[in-house]
Amino acid sequence: DSFSRMKVEKKSDGVTEIDDVLLIETQGETAQALAIRLARPVVVVDKMAGKVVTIAAAAVNPDSATRKAIYYLQQQGKTVLQIADYPGMLIWRTVAMIINEALDALQKGVASEQDIDTAMRLGVNYPYGPLAWGAQLGWQRILRLLENLQHHYGEERYRPCSLLRQRALLESGYES
């Protein structure tokens, strides 16, 4: 079929170009906002390790842009669910909130970092404890996502805790 000849190029971490379509991992912005700002078709993908990914396409995209993204992700062995185009999407938004809450509990002395991770991994059957997850996913990315959600919705629940800000700052210092 026509999709088998797509030109795919990894532009950077979290950004893949499929012909004229940008497939961008969520940082909290909508596909529509990105498509308008970048003046090209954008599909935002919300994925972690695992077989399921959710995508949101900009309303200004041609239908073929979304079909290309779905085809590409399916070729990677992913099950693709298309959801509404909202900031933070679904998976990342939820995980970022859990990580932020775990950092808040750590900061307030509720439990040690190891105990929080063990309790959530064994008690809720998460693949990782939220603090180990945060370190793996990147504190800066989680901070950026929560800041985008707070900016968009104006809700206090998305406010990043100060320990997240500290860890993101430390992480940025190690990357320079």
Regions found by a protein language model. Give the residues of each.
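NAD(P)-dependent Rossmann-like dehydrogenase/reductase catalytic/cofactor-binding core
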Residues: 1-89, 93-97, 101-176
